[in-house]
């Protein structure tokens, strides 16, 4: 028997087929560190259809070898998938983990089918001034520091991890992303105690620096889910504990700014990943897709709404510098 369902994230859709019901993604998703809710605002179950944007086929073969094949917009996994799910060392790098296959497949389909581009970034919205701050960077760059300090300063949450945009007839349009952030408990205790959850009680210093939690920040989200033509500030940070001062370097050269944007937009689509500690999955990127993304990167940095594109070198306390000045 074949079990079928579908998934929608923003406008993109994927049909799932599995030889085992136990392999299918389980709804509703939980708020936890490996959840796709730390990547996207909503992950919605929809009816299966042959006409969806992508297709994912899972064939559990207990005695077989793990294999992955991509043909067009159809991906097939076969092998001892149920056993791999149970024994993997890091469930984030699995079919449904927040660093895994479906996460990257959806980013690919959003670009390919809907021309929706996705920053690896947090987004904060100044509702009074109609200004969107996009803080772009990988793990350890300082996104969480900007996220929590921005909320503490009165900005509204637009996304914790993934910020989406598309050029539309009505103007440059931004789509709300994830509202849950994976944060190390030690960061909360040291820098943002006002956000500490009750579970921190009784934890040792070693424990709080080893453990991450999925912090639901939906209480601070912006009113609009879609923002059209906001004033835009794009920040590429490097935040270091113990560093003094605030150093901002505006990216005046549009070529360098566009490259920084392109590199960030490409990261999760282009990189290869190992699932279940043993199954390599190449990136989805190709020439036409990359060319369209580079064109979008130049269009973004040159757009009339772009107030500044800047790099920042600072510490958690001074990271905003004069960026919030109107």
Regions found by a protein language model. Name each.
Residues 146-147:
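Post-Walker A alpha-helix
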Residues 156-157:
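GT-A fold catalytic core of metal-dependent nucleotide-sugar glycosyltransferases
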